[in-house]
Amino acid sequence: MAAWAPCRRWGWAAVSFGRHPGLSASLARKPPRAWWLSACRQKASLSFLNRSELPNLAYKRLKGKTPGIIFIPGYLSNMNGIKAVAVEEFCKSLGHAFIRFDYSGIGSSDGNLAECTVGKWRKDVLSILDDVAEGPQILVGSSLGGWLMLHAAIARPEKVIALIGIATAADGLVTQYHALPVETQKEIEMKGEWTLPSRYNKEGYFRIPYSFIKEAEHHCLLHSPIPVTCPVRLLHGMKDEIVPWQRSLQVADRIVSPDVDVILRKQGDHRMKEKADIHLLICTIDDLIDKLSTVVP
């Protein structure tokens, strides 16, 4: 049974799907850390993962203790976002390993964006896990990255020991597309492109190839149980106009792991990058590191 435990101080609520104490109480007890100011200002240097038959991937890595943290960005986002950098600073302050990277076709990575698909970006995540990361990892996925982290946990259960999703967009654009009127879907198919309005793009919209949507259909997860057995934390803003917060409840319901919490931010939007949002994210990571420290060598 899901149990709500609102915390007025920070304005979030935890919904526990497992037989363990909800996160909201422990989060409320944690004082804000001084990691914002005390962490070293030096950033990890830019490196490239060379792949023989795939585009080279740009990444930044901090070596340190396990479990390591890997930040998986959202759709068309690069590794330099506020959340990714904040998590890096926190990991640096604790001495934990951390990786952030750009998908192929994005940011500093090689590749042609027009040819990118969910399947290719899934391979990017697995490449980082297989060829860059060392030891057990906690994956932090934002939006599309939340969808891809689920795929990574399914494909590499021996290496992925926990997940944190931020506005997890499982089945993302596919669900939005199929919610359109049939006539609109036919128009998009004829044009070969979907012009999707968005205030998060300076042009006011995204141009999404029809082929991208059709390929993404092969990676949908919500139609059946999701075979992820590790601890999962799903953070979502209730003012998210891109991915409704109910999507995180759907994901939680589908995941087979008994250790799943959904944490809602009443004032949070899709990007979840305000100070209180970042604080919640950091506390959630800290909580999982504490939890896993008893089982991870």
Swiss-Prot record:
Q: Where is the transit peptide?
A: 1-43
The primary site where this protein sits is mitochondrion
Under the heading Pfam families, the entry gives: Abhydrolase_1 (PF00561)
Ranges for domain AB hydrolase-1 come to 69-196
* Compartment(s): Mitochondrion
Which key words are in the record? Hydrolase, Mitochondrion, Transit peptide
Means of activity regulation: Inhibited by palmostatin-B.
Can you supply one Gene Ontology CC term for this chain's record? cytosol
What's its top-level EC category? hydrolase
What is the documented function of this protein? Acts as an acyl-protein thioesterase that hydrolyzes fatty acids from acylated residues in proteins. Regulates the mitochondrial S-depalmitoylation of the nucleophilic active site residue of peroxiredoxin-5/PRDX5, a key antioxidant protein, therefore modulating mitochondrial antioxidant ability. Also catalyzes the deglucuronidation of mycophenolic acid acyl-glucuronide, an active metabolite of the immunosuppressant drug mycophenolate.
| Record-given protein name | Palmitoyl-protein thioesterase ABHD10, mitochondrial
Q: Which organism is it from?
A: Mus musculus
Query: Its encoding gene is what?
Result: Abhd10
